[in-house]
Structures are given as C-alpha cells and as structure tokens.
Amino acid sequence: MMMGRLVFVIWLYNCLCLLLLSSLVDADQANIDCLRTFKSQVEDPNRYLSTWVFGNETAGYICKFSGVTCWHDDENRVLSIKLSGYGLRGVFPPAVKLCADLTGLDLSRNNFSGPLPANISTLIPLVTILDLSYNSFSGEIPMLISNITFLNTLMLQHNQFTGTLPPQLAQLGRLKTFSVSDNRLVGPIPNFNQTLQFKQELFANNLDLCGKPLDDCKSASSSRGKVVIIAAVGGLTAAALVVGVVLFFYFRKLGAVRKKQDDPEGNRWAKSLKGQKGVKVFMFKKSVSKMKLSDLMKATEEFKKDNIIATGRTGTMYKGRLEDGSLLMIKRLQDSQRSEKEFDAEMKTLGSVKNRNLVPLLGYCVANKERLLMYEYMANGYLYDQLHPADEESFKPLDWPSRLKIAIGTAKGLAWLHHSCNPRIIHRNISSKCILLTAEFEPKISDFGLARLMNPIDTHLSTFVNGEFGDFGYVAPEYSRTMVATPKGDVYSFGVVLLELVTGQKATSVTKVSEEKAEEENFKGNLVEWITKLSSESKLQEAIDRSLLGNGVDDEIFKVLKVACNCVLPEIAKQRPTMFEVYQLLRAIGESYNFTADDDILIPSESGEGDFIEELIVAR
C-alpha cells in the first residue's frame, strides 16, 4: 500500500515538472514569435532590426537583439522593447500581444501612423512605460487605454490625435509622467489626481483643450451657440471654396507625385531650409573663406541620398564638394535637444579639441532646429567599410602594417582624450564606424563629445544594453548594472575594435570558415563571446584573419590579440588597463614601424586618475 502511494507521488511530481517545462517552452516560443511578427509588421528602411536574426536555439538569444531587453539573459522572455529613433514605419504593431510579460514599449521618434487599436489594453496589459511620441498616429485616443492599469508613463505628444481625451484616463492611479501636447485634441482635460499637478505645456498646442491646468471650459450653451455660428460661416465659406479646392488639387496632383518621386527619401528636411540659405556657417579657422548654408546645400546637392557616407546613432554624415573642388564631410545631428545658446557653447568647446588622431571639426551651422557639423574629409572612409565591405568580390583586405598603424593611432587618440584633453572626454561611442582613415590610412576618431548633444539618456536598462549612445556589440557589460559611463567602458569598446582588426569579423556576429569543411559555419553569438569561447579552449590562434598569417608577423598579430583580450575579457571593469597602458603596449609592438611621433599624452598619476575622469562632455 505504501509502495503504491510512493509510486503515485513520483508520477504526479514528474507530471507537474513536465507541465512546467512545457509552459516555459511555450512562453519562450511566444516571445520569439512576438519579435519575428513585429519585425514583419513594420518597415525598417535603416535596417536597425537587422540584428533580429531568428533560428538560433541558444537560450536567451533574442535578448541580444537591438532594442530588446529580457527579464533574464538566459531566457527568451521580453521585458521591454525600445526602438526610439529607428526610422520605423507602419501602424501600431499588434504582434506585441505575444510578448505577454512586456512592461516597457518605446516607439517614439519614428514614422508610425494610423489609429491606435481600440483594444490596446489587451495587447499590452502589463506595460508601465508607453512612449509613442513624435510619430504620426491619428484618430481618437482609445478609451480602453485606461485599462492598462500599471501605466506610470504615457507619452503621446507630437502626433495627430483628434477628438477628446478619454475621461477614464483619470482612473490611471499610478500615472506619474504624461503628455499629449502638439496634437489636435479638443474638449475638457480629465480630472486627474490633484497631487500630479501636470503643467500646461503637457497639453499645449492642441485645437481646443480646456480645464485645469489650462483655462476653464465654457458653458454648454455658449459652446452650442459658438458651434452654430461657426457651422453657418463654415458652410458659406465651404460652398465658395469647394470648386477652387478641387481644381487646385486636380492640377497639382501630377506635379506633386512627380516631385515626390524626384525627391530622394530622407532629404525633405533639407528642402524645408530653402528660406534659411543665408544663415552663416561658423568656421573655427578664420583663414577659411566665409560660408553660408547655401554653400553646404550646393555642396551636397541639397543633401541628396547619394551623398550619404554613413548613418549612425548620432546622425547622418554627408559628402560635400565645394565650388573650388575641395571635399568636406557634413554631419546632420540626430535630434539634438540643446538650445541654440547651449549648442554654441558646446561647439566652441569641441572646436578647441585638436589632436592628430581626431577628425578636425571645421565649423557648424544652426538653421531652424537643424544642427550641422563640418569635418575634414577622409579619403579612405570608415574603418568598418574597409574591414567589412559591401562588395566582397573586389575586396582587398588591409595588410597587417596598415591594421597595426590604425590600432596604434586610434589608441593614441583615445588615450589623449582620456588623459590629456582639457576637458577630459569619455567617448562612449567607440566602434569601427567612428574611426575614419586618411589617404595614408592614418586613423582619426570622430563623434567625440557628441553624446552630450543627443537626447538626455533615461535610466531604462535597455538604453545601456543596446547602446543608445554606443553601437550594438561594443557596449561594455557593466552598463546594464551601473548605468554610468566610464573610461573603462571606452577601453572595452576599443578592445572590440582591436578584435575586428585581428579577426576581420564583425562585432555583432561571427562567420568563420571551418578547417574541416569548405562551407561557412556561423557561430551563434557576437565577437567577444566567440573570443571568450576560444580563449577558454586555448584556441585563440583560430580567431586570426587567415589573410594575415604566414607573412612573418604572426608574433605581432598574436600580441595585439592578447592586448584586445585584456580589454574585453575581464568582467570587472577595474581589471582592464587604462587607455594609456593600452597605447603603450601597442606602441611597443609596432616600434619597428615608426608609426608614432613624439607623445603628447600626459602620464596618468598613480592615484588612478584615468578611472575617474570628470564627465564634462558625455551624455547626462
């Protein structure tokens, strides 16, 4: 009898374990399906979602996707999706319903349009942060949005919402941050909890909102009388104008379509500046001839898409040719939130930062809300394009002396920023996409100091995990814990660049040719994870780019690889070397090449000065 009970208990325990395991597997698959369907439901012209590659069976692999944060790194359960400023298009993606544990959704500063789903509360019932600002969403704000009872933050500003605000919004007891400014809303503002004390600007620039904190609403009879008068006048006016409007659009239609086709996608902002062409460009070198915005427009053919050199988190870089034939690079900053006065002050500071291994900032221009920076042109473009070209058939790999020269020069420039520049600068965006090369393959670092000019960083985990101000694959792991930028974070990012130079692999993914097979094998992870695996197996030599081997410099290559490992493998940031130490190690390896001139880097004090740089020009 006792034996029978024991067998039953064991059977029941096994059944419960199998049931739990099955539910976990189903939940993982639902989250994977959520992101896969989400990706298919939106347009991604800038290919920021290219890291969303499915089919990997590794636990937690979707947690490495750009903009995605998981509850735990070793399980496919999505905590938040943050895709602000990705340039995505489409309607509100209903696929988010499959991410059942989602608590944060940020689709701000994209090109989403159309109405919000009426059943939005059933799609994201547990979300605490919902940011849909700076899009083109339209229609009425759904009444059922008030059923997302855990909402702490609701940002709907800068859209095209119409109608009235649902009075049920006042029932959101946890709401602390809220804005509906710059829409087309009318009617009374809900009677929010008085302790919230929402400011007027959170409701500003709508058609006719009223009630606290705005002006009191008028009486119903007065409103009805006003409506009658407006309707009568509007009817007479409409009757007189309707024929003219129809004819106007009839004759304009073909021209508008043709103009849209001729207008390269992405430069409408430039055409809107035609009335600002007389705006002067501030140049740091007084010897340079005076320039105006019209000169920049002409040099870039009104910032045509064909002249784009690269697009990144800080903005888009264009190639420009002046009338005298000289070339320069012009960066359009992405959503700088600084006032013109603050921006001028920052530019004056950055304009004084000069070093052989930094891209010289020649000048800047402010026109309306646009911020344009002028840089010296670099003939060999970005290091990323030299290592990972789009056309691999005509690709000629960089030889080892060129790669070592790039490594030493970049290390020297970054060490100067950390240890000798006044003010000291933490870059925060080091990658092969911010290292430009001259005609002689002399490296120059760009984007230094730009993090402070971008949108203020929030404290959300995904900001750091996914590199809001750092390219995906280069961000030091401690950001997800400390949420503080440090020089050792730059050291980690530079270590990844060194790995790219030695291996020829991309930071975000690895493609290696098997020694046993002639086919390609894909390692399921990023470059640092691959190096970590090879290091644990004592197989680091397998990581080296084969085009570099057998030329009598194998010892130098392996030494640089070891320096890179010292930068990226320690889990504790303090165990990494300083940039000054990294530079000294690389300089010693390349001593026979005579790459570097006299040092202009101050030797750090023994007090650890390099670890505690005052962040004068970094993101707040």
Curated annotation (Swiss-Prot):
Record: glycosylation sites: 56, 111, 119, 147, 193
Pfam families assigned to the protein according to its UniProt record, in alphabetical order: LRR_1, LRRNT_2, PK_Tyr_Ser-Thr
Residues carrying Phosphothreonine: 300, 463, 482
Gene3D superfamilies recorded: Phosphorylase Kinase, domain 1, Ribonuclease Inhibitor, Transferase(Phosphotransferase) domain 1
Residue spans crossing the bilayer: 229-249
Phosphotyrosine PTM positions: 479
Membrane topology: Single-pass type I membrane protein
This protein's domain notes: The protein kinase domain is predicted to be catalytically inactive. Lacks the conserved Asp active site at position 429, which is replaced by an Asn residue.
Protein name per the record: Probably inactive leucine-rich repeat receptor-like protein kinase At5g48380
UniProt source species: Arabidopsis thaliana (Mouse-ear cress)
